[in-house]
Amino acid sequence: MRSRVLWGAARWLWPRRAVGPARRPLSSGSPPLEELFTRGGPLRTFLERQAGSEAHLKVRRPELLAVIKLLNEKERELRETEHLLHDENEDLRKLAENEITLCQKEITQLKHQIILLLVPSEETDENDLILEVTAGVGGQEAMLFTSEIFDMYQQYAAFKRWHFETLEYFPSELGGLRHASASIGGSEAYRHMKFEGGVHRVQRVPKTEKQGRVHTSTMTVAILPQPTEINLVINPKDLRIDTKRASGAGGQHVNTTDSAVRIVHLPTGVVSECQQERSQLKNKELAMTKLRAKLYSMHLEEEINKRQNARKIQIGSKGRSEKIRTYNFPQNRVTDHRINKTLHDLETFMQGDYLLDELVQSLKEYADYESLVEIISQKV
Protein backbone atom coordinates (compact mmCIF):
# COMPACT_ATOMS: atom_id res chain seq x y z
CA MET A 1 0.00 0.00 0.00
CA ARG A 2 2.85 2.37 0.86
CA SER A 3 4.49 1.92 -2.54
CA ARG A 4 1.21 2.72 -4.27
CA VAL A 5 0.94 6.00 -2.39
CA LEU A 6 4.55 6.94 -3.16
CA TRP A 7 4.19 6.13 -6.82
CA GLY A 8 0.89 7.99 -6.96
CA ALA A 9 2.48 11.07 -5.42
CA ALA A 10 5.22 11.07 -8.02
CA ARG A 11 2.67 11.22 -10.81
CA TRP A 12 1.59 14.67 -9.75
CA LEU A 13 4.98 16.36 -10.14
CA TRP A 14 3.55 17.40 -13.46
CA PRO A 15 -0.17 18.20 -13.50
CA ARG A 16 -2.64 15.96 -15.29
CA ARG A 17 -4.35 18.98 -16.80
CA ALA A 18 -1.60 21.31 -17.84
CA VAL A 19 -3.80 24.34 -18.37
CA GLY A 20 -1.55 26.93 -16.86
CA PRO A 21 1.97 27.41 -15.64
CA ALA A 22 3.37 24.16 -14.30
CA ARG A 23 2.81 23.70 -10.59
CA ARG A 24 6.56 23.81 -10.22
CA PRO A 25 8.67 24.19 -13.35
CA LEU A 26 11.31 21.67 -14.24
CA SER A 27 14.53 23.22 -13.06
CA SER A 28 17.52 23.61 -15.34
CA GLY A 29 19.21 21.24 -12.91
CA SER A 30 16.81 18.38 -13.61
CA PRO A 31 19.21 15.45 -13.71
CA PRO A 32 20.31 14.20 -17.12
CA LEU A 33 20.43 10.48 -17.76
CA GLU A 34 24.07 9.95 -16.78
CA GLU A 35 23.65 11.89 -13.54
CA LEU A 36 20.73 9.70 -12.49
CA PHE A 37 22.77 6.53 -12.96
CA THR A 38 25.97 7.72 -11.25
CA ARG A 39 27.61 4.95 -9.23
CA GLY A 40 26.94 5.36 -5.53
CA GLY A 41 23.98 7.64 -6.20
CA PRO A 42 20.42 7.06 -4.90
CA LEU A 43 19.17 5.47 -8.11
CA ARG A 44 22.05 3.00 -8.21
CA THR A 45 21.43 2.16 -4.56
CA PHE A 46 17.76 1.62 -5.32
CA LEU A 47 18.48 -0.62 -8.31
CA GLU A 48 21.04 -2.65 -6.35
CA ARG A 49 18.46 -3.25 -3.62
CA GLN A 50 15.90 -4.25 -6.23
CA ALA A 51 18.35 -6.64 -7.89
CA GLY A 52 19.35 -7.97 -4.48
CA SER A 53 15.81 -9.17 -3.84
CA GLU A 54 15.59 -11.36 -6.94
CA ALA A 55 12.91 -13.65 -5.54
CA HIS A 56 10.62 -10.65 -5.01
CA LEU A 57 11.36 -9.16 -8.44
CA LYS A 58 10.89 -12.46 -10.28
CA VAL A 59 7.29 -12.47 -9.12
CA ARG A 60 6.47 -8.73 -9.09
CA ARG A 61 8.80 -7.10 -11.66
CA PRO A 62 10.49 -9.75 -13.82
CA GLU A 63 10.97 -7.33 -16.72
CA LEU A 64 12.75 -4.82 -14.44
CA LEU A 65 15.05 -7.51 -13.08
CA ALA A 66 15.98 -8.59 -16.61
CA VAL A 67 16.85 -5.04 -17.71
CA ILE A 68 18.90 -4.35 -14.53
CA LYS A 69 20.92 -7.53 -15.14
CA LEU A 70 21.47 -6.61 -18.78
CA LEU A 71 22.58 -3.09 -17.83
CA ASN A 72 25.12 -4.46 -15.36
CA GLU A 73 26.46 -6.86 -17.98
CA LYS A 74 26.77 -4.13 -20.61
CA GLU A 75 28.55 -1.78 -18.22
CA ARG A 76 30.98 -4.54 -17.27
CA GLU A 77 31.55 -5.22 -20.97
CA LEU A 78 32.20 -1.50 -21.54
CA ARG A 79 34.80 -1.32 -18.76
CA GLU A 80 36.61 -4.37 -20.11
CA THR A 81 36.60 -3.00 -23.66
CA GLU A 82 37.95 0.37 -22.52
CA HIS A 83 41.14 -1.36 -21.36
CA LEU A 84 41.82 -2.32 -24.99
CA LEU A 85 42.16 1.36 -25.93
CA HIS A 86 45.69 1.23 -24.49
CA ASP A 87 46.70 -1.87 -26.46
CA GLU A 88 49.75 -1.62 -28.72
CA ASN A 89 47.85 -3.12 -31.65
CA GLU A 90 46.25 -0.26 -33.64
CA ASP A 91 43.65 -2.51 -35.31
CA LEU A 92 42.57 -3.77 -31.89
CA ARG A 93 42.25 -0.19 -30.62
CA LYS A 94 40.03 0.77 -33.57
CA LEU A 95 37.90 -2.31 -33.02
CA ALA A 96 37.59 -1.37 -29.34
CA GLU A 97 36.48 2.17 -30.25
CA ASN A 98 33.68 0.82 -32.44
CA GLU A 99 32.62 -1.65 -29.74
CA ILE A 100 32.59 1.13 -27.10
CA THR A 101 30.35 3.36 -29.27
CA LEU A 102 27.89 0.52 -29.80
CA CYS A 103 27.99 -0.47 -26.13
CA GLN A 104 27.36 3.10 -24.94
CA LYS A 105 24.33 3.35 -27.22
CA GLU A 106 22.90 0.10 -25.84
CA ILE A 107 23.54 1.26 -22.25
CA THR A 108 21.65 4.52 -22.90
CA GLN A 109 18.70 2.58 -24.31
CA LEU A 110 18.67 0.28 -21.27
CA LYS A 111 18.69 3.25 -18.90
CA HIS A 112 15.70 4.78 -20.69
CA GLN A 113 13.98 1.40 -20.45
CA ILE A 114 14.55 1.29 -16.68
CA ILE A 115 13.07 4.77 -16.27
CA LEU A 116 9.97 3.75 -18.23
CA LEU A 117 9.59 0.64 -16.05
CA LEU A 118 10.02 2.55 -12.79
CA VAL A 119 7.81 5.56 -13.53
CA PRO A 120 4.13 4.58 -13.56
CA SER A 121 1.90 5.92 -16.31
CA GLU A 122 -1.14 8.02 -15.47
CA GLU A 123 -4.56 6.50 -15.82
CA THR A 124 -5.40 9.24 -18.34
CA ASP A 125 -2.36 8.71 -20.60
CA GLU A 126 -4.32 6.55 -23.03
CA ASN A 127 -7.29 8.96 -23.11
CA ASP A 128 -8.40 11.21 -25.92
CA LEU A 129 -8.41 14.93 -25.13
CA ILE A 130 -10.06 18.29 -25.61
CA LEU A 131 -7.79 21.08 -26.87
CA GLU A 132 -8.81 24.67 -26.14
CA VAL A 133 -6.98 27.76 -27.42
CA THR A 134 -7.78 31.32 -26.33
CA ALA A 135 -6.22 34.63 -27.37
CA GLY A 136 -4.60 36.51 -24.49
CA VAL A 137 -2.72 39.81 -24.30
CA GLY A 138 -1.95 41.57 -27.56
CA GLY A 139 -5.17 42.27 -29.45
CA GLN A 140 -5.28 41.21 -33.10
CA GLU A 141 -1.68 39.98 -33.02
CA ALA A 142 -2.58 37.60 -30.16
CA MET A 143 -5.56 36.36 -32.19
CA LEU A 144 -3.39 35.75 -35.26
CA PHE A 145 -0.92 33.81 -33.13
CA THR A 146 -3.77 31.80 -31.59
CA SER A 147 -4.88 30.80 -35.09
CA GLU A 148 -1.34 29.68 -35.96
CA ILE A 149 -1.03 27.59 -32.78
CA PHE A 150 -4.39 25.93 -33.42
CA ASP A 151 -3.27 25.09 -36.96
CA MET A 152 0.05 23.77 -35.59
CA TYR A 153 -1.73 21.31 -33.31
CA GLN A 154 -4.05 20.22 -36.11
CA GLN A 155 -0.99 19.45 -38.24
CA TYR A 156 0.66 17.68 -35.29
CA ALA A 157 -2.43 15.48 -34.95
CA ALA A 158 -2.09 14.58 -38.63
CA PHE A 159 1.64 13.90 -38.11
CA LYS A 160 0.80 11.49 -35.24
CA ARG A 161 -2.13 10.04 -37.24
CA TRP A 162 -4.66 11.11 -34.64
CA HIS A 163 -8.28 12.09 -35.24
CA PHE A 164 -8.89 15.87 -35.03
CA GLU A 165 -12.40 17.33 -34.87
CA THR A 166 -13.08 21.04 -34.42
CA LEU A 167 -15.72 21.68 -31.75
CA GLU A 168 -15.72 25.49 -31.66
CA TYR A 169 -14.15 28.15 -33.85
CA PHE A 170 -14.61 31.88 -33.23
CA PRO A 171 -12.51 33.87 -35.73
CA SER A 172 -11.63 37.55 -35.45
CA GLU A 173 -12.38 40.16 -38.08
CA LEU A 174 -8.80 40.22 -39.44
CA GLY A 175 -8.28 36.49 -39.87
CA GLY A 176 -7.19 35.67 -36.35
CA LEU A 177 -8.84 33.43 -33.77
CA ARG A 178 -10.48 34.50 -30.52
CA HIS A 179 -11.18 31.01 -29.20
CA ALA A 180 -11.42 27.47 -30.52
CA SER A 181 -11.64 23.93 -29.22
CA ALA A 182 -11.12 20.52 -30.76
CA SER A 183 -11.41 16.86 -29.88
CA ILE A 184 -8.20 14.89 -30.48
CA GLY A 185 -8.11 11.10 -30.33
CA GLY A 186 -5.50 8.49 -31.04
CA SER A 187 -2.73 6.38 -29.55
CA GLU A 188 -1.49 8.01 -26.31
CA ALA A 189 -2.82 11.40 -27.43
CA TYR A 190 -3.15 12.81 -23.91
CA ARG A 191 0.25 11.41 -22.87
CA HIS A 192 1.89 13.42 -25.63
CA MET A 193 -0.19 16.59 -25.37
CA LYS A 194 -0.59 17.03 -21.61
CA PHE A 195 2.47 19.29 -21.26
CA GLU A 196 1.30 21.71 -23.97
CA GLY A 197 -1.12 23.47 -21.62
CA GLY A 198 -0.19 26.95 -20.41
CA VAL A 199 0.60 30.41 -21.70
CA HIS A 200 2.47 30.60 -25.00
CA ARG A 201 4.24 33.89 -25.76
CA VAL A 202 5.13 35.25 -29.20
CA GLN A 203 7.68 37.96 -29.96
CA ARG A 204 7.67 39.37 -33.48
CA VAL A 205 6.96 42.43 -35.63
CA PRO A 206 3.21 42.45 -36.42
CA LYS A 207 2.14 42.95 -40.03
CA THR A 208 0.39 46.16 -38.97
CA GLU A 209 3.53 47.58 -37.29
CA LYS A 210 4.96 50.31 -39.53
CA GLN A 211 8.01 51.19 -37.40
CA GLY A 212 9.40 47.66 -37.23
CA ARG A 213 9.06 47.29 -33.47
CA VAL A 214 8.89 43.83 -31.90
CA HIS A 215 5.64 43.23 -29.99
CA THR A 216 4.93 40.62 -27.32
CA SER A 217 1.58 38.81 -27.30
CA THR A 218 0.20 35.74 -25.56
CA MET A 219 -2.34 32.98 -25.97
CA THR A 220 -3.44 30.15 -23.70
CA VAL A 221 -3.66 26.42 -24.38
CA ALA A 222 -5.79 24.12 -22.22
CA ILE A 223 -5.55 20.33 -22.42
CA LEU A 224 -8.36 18.29 -20.85
CA PRO A 225 -8.41 14.47 -20.84
CA GLN A 226 -11.65 13.00 -22.14
CA PRO A 227 -13.23 10.47 -19.79
CA THR A 228 -14.44 7.05 -20.82
CA GLU A 229 -17.96 5.89 -20.00
CA ILE A 230 -16.52 4.05 -16.99
CA ASN A 231 -14.61 7.10 -15.71
CA LEU A 232 -17.60 9.41 -15.47
CA VAL A 233 -21.35 8.98 -15.24
CA ILE A 234 -23.61 12.05 -15.61
CA ASN A 235 -27.21 12.00 -14.44
CA PRO A 236 -29.42 13.48 -17.20
CA LYS A 237 -31.53 15.12 -14.47
CA ASP A 238 -28.50 17.25 -13.57
CA LEU A 239 -28.45 18.90 -17.00
CA ARG A 240 -30.26 21.93 -18.38
CA ILE A 241 -30.13 22.03 -22.17
CA ASP A 242 -30.98 25.25 -24.01
CA THR A 243 -31.08 25.86 -27.76
CA LYS A 244 -30.70 29.12 -29.65
CA ARG A 245 -29.97 30.41 -33.10
CA ALA A 246 -26.38 30.21 -34.25
CA SER A 247 -24.44 33.42 -34.76
CA GLY A 248 -21.38 34.26 -36.82
CA ALA A 249 -20.20 32.72 -40.08
CA GLY A 250 -22.50 30.20 -41.68
CA GLY A 251 -24.31 31.69 -44.67
CA GLN A 252 -28.09 31.33 -44.88
CA HIS A 253 -28.09 28.88 -41.99
CA VAL A 254 -27.21 31.59 -39.45
CA ASN A 255 -30.16 32.87 -37.40
CA THR A 256 -32.69 30.66 -39.20
CA THR A 257 -32.75 27.55 -36.99
CA ASP A 258 -32.18 26.87 -33.30
CA SER A 259 -29.11 24.73 -33.92
CA ALA A 260 -26.79 26.17 -31.24
CA VAL A 261 -26.80 24.19 -27.97
CA ARG A 262 -25.92 25.30 -24.44
CA ILE A 263 -25.68 22.70 -21.65
CA VAL A 264 -25.44 23.57 -17.95
CA HIS A 265 -24.42 21.00 -15.34
CA LEU A 266 -26.61 22.21 -12.48
CA PRO A 267 -24.68 20.75 -9.49
CA THR A 268 -21.42 22.44 -10.53
CA GLY A 269 -22.54 25.30 -12.76
CA VAL A 270 -20.18 24.14 -15.53
CA VAL A 271 -21.34 25.35 -18.95
CA SER A 272 -20.62 23.92 -22.39
CA GLU A 273 -21.77 25.39 -25.70
CA CYS A 274 -21.51 24.43 -29.35
CA GLN A 275 -22.78 25.98 -32.57
CA GLN A 276 -20.16 24.60 -34.94
CA GLU A 277 -22.46 22.27 -36.88
CA ARG A 278 -25.72 22.84 -38.77
CA SER A 279 -27.34 19.95 -36.92
CA GLN A 280 -28.69 20.63 -33.43
CA LEU A 281 -28.21 16.94 -32.59
CA LYS A 282 -24.55 17.06 -33.61
CA ASN A 283 -23.98 20.27 -31.64
CA LYS A 284 -25.55 18.66 -28.59
CA GLU A 285 -23.22 15.67 -28.95
CA LEU A 286 -20.14 17.92 -29.24
CA ALA A 287 -21.25 20.10 -26.31
CA MET A 288 -21.65 16.96 -24.17
CA THR A 289 -18.15 15.83 -25.15
CA LYS A 290 -16.73 19.14 -23.89
CA LEU A 291 -18.87 19.07 -20.75
CA ARG A 292 -17.72 15.56 -19.85
CA ALA A 293 -14.08 16.57 -20.30
CA LYS A 294 -14.54 19.63 -18.06
CA LEU A 295 -16.27 17.63 -15.31
CA TYR A 296 -13.68 14.86 -15.53
CA SER A 297 -10.88 17.40 -15.23
CA MET A 298 -12.56 18.87 -12.15
CA HIS A 299 -12.74 15.37 -10.68
CA LEU A 300 -9.02 14.83 -11.32
CA GLU A 301 -8.15 18.12 -9.65
CA GLU A 302 -10.18 17.10 -6.59
CA GLU A 303 -8.14 13.89 -6.46
CA ILE A 304 -4.93 15.91 -6.62
CA ASN A 305 -6.09 18.09 -3.74
CA LYS A 306 -7.03 15.07 -1.64
CA ARG A 307 -3.67 13.36 -2.13
CA GLN A 308 -1.30 16.28 -1.97
CA ASN A 309 -3.31 19.24 -0.71
CA ALA A 310 -2.16 20.96 -3.89
CA ARG A 311 -3.55 24.21 -5.19
CA LYS A 312 -5.88 24.02 -8.16
CA ILE A 313 -4.30 24.30 -11.55
CA GLN A 314 -5.69 27.37 -13.28
CA ILE A 315 -5.29 29.00 -16.62
CA GLY A 316 -4.32 32.20 -14.83
CA SER A 317 -4.56 35.77 -16.03
CA LYS A 318 -2.94 35.07 -19.41
CA GLY A 319 -0.44 37.82 -18.60
CA ARG A 320 2.85 38.23 -20.42
CA SER A 321 4.89 36.96 -17.46
CA GLU A 322 3.05 33.62 -17.09
CA LYS A 323 4.65 31.61 -19.84
CA ILE A 324 5.73 28.07 -20.54
CA ARG A 325 7.13 28.74 -24.01
CA THR A 326 8.35 31.68 -26.10
CA TYR A 327 8.24 31.85 -29.89
CA ASN A 328 10.82 34.46 -30.93
CA PHE A 329 10.51 35.12 -34.66
CA PRO A 330 13.32 37.72 -35.05
CA GLN A 331 15.76 35.20 -33.53
CA ASN A 332 14.15 32.21 -35.29
CA ARG A 333 13.87 30.17 -32.09
CA VAL A 334 11.36 28.59 -29.72
CA THR A 335 12.27 28.14 -26.04
CA ASP A 336 10.46 25.98 -23.50
CA HIS A 337 11.16 27.64 -20.15
CA ARG A 338 10.32 24.57 -18.04
CA ILE A 339 13.31 22.62 -19.31
CA ASN A 340 15.37 25.50 -20.74
CA LYS A 341 15.37 23.85 -24.16
CA THR A 342 15.70 25.96 -27.31
CA LEU A 343 15.05 24.81 -30.87
CA HIS A 344 15.84 26.82 -33.97
CA ASP A 345 14.02 26.95 -37.32
CA LEU A 346 10.75 28.34 -35.98
CA GLU A 347 9.01 28.09 -39.34
CA THR A 348 9.52 24.33 -39.39
CA PHE A 349 8.48 24.05 -35.74
CA MET A 350 5.16 25.77 -36.50
CA GLN A 351 4.43 23.11 -39.12
CA GLY A 352 3.67 20.75 -36.24
CA ASP A 353 5.73 17.74 -37.21
CA TYR A 354 9.13 16.37 -36.15
CA LEU A 355 10.49 19.46 -34.33
CA LEU A 356 7.39 19.83 -32.17
CA ASP A 357 7.49 16.09 -31.56
CA GLU A 358 11.14 16.40 -30.46
CA LEU A 359 10.18 19.00 -27.85
CA VAL A 360 7.22 16.91 -26.69
CA GLN A 361 9.54 13.92 -26.22
CA SER A 362 11.99 16.05 -24.21
CA LEU A 363 9.21 17.24 -21.92
CA LYS A 364 8.06 13.65 -21.35
CA GLU A 365 11.62 12.53 -20.56
CA TYR A 366 12.24 15.34 -18.07
CA ALA A 367 8.90 14.68 -16.40
CA ASP A 368 9.85 11.01 -16.05
CA TYR A 369 13.25 11.97 -14.60
CA GLU A 370 11.69 14.20 -11.95
CA SER A 371 9.09 11.57 -11.09
CA LEU A 372 11.86 8.99 -10.77
CA VAL A 373 13.91 11.24 -8.49
CA GLU A 374 10.85 11.70 -6.28
CA ILE A 375 10.22 7.95 -6.13
CA ILE A 376 13.84 7.14 -5.33
CA SER A 377 14.20 9.86 -2.70
CA GLN A 378 11.27 8.42 -0.76
CA LYS A 379 12.23 4.76 -1.15
CA VAL A 380 15.97 4.86 -0.51
From Swiss-Prot:
The GGQ domain interacts with the peptidyltransferase center (PTC) of the large ribosomal subunit to trigger nascent chain hydrolysis. Methylation of glutamine in the GGQ triplet by HEMK1 is conserved from bacteria to mammals. The keyword Coiled coil applies. Belongs to the prokaryotic/mitochondrial release factor family. Residues 236-300 are annotated as: GGQ domain. Mitochondrial peptide chain release factor that directs the termination of translation in response to the peptide chain termination codons UAA and UAG. GO terms for biological process: mitochondrial translational termination. This is Peptide chain release factor 1-like, mitochondrial. Expressed in skeletal muscle (at protein level). PANTHER family: LD18447P, PEPTIDE CHAIN RELEASE FACTOR 1-LIKE, MITOCHONDRIAL. GO terms for molecular function: translation release factor activity; translation release factor activity, codon specific.
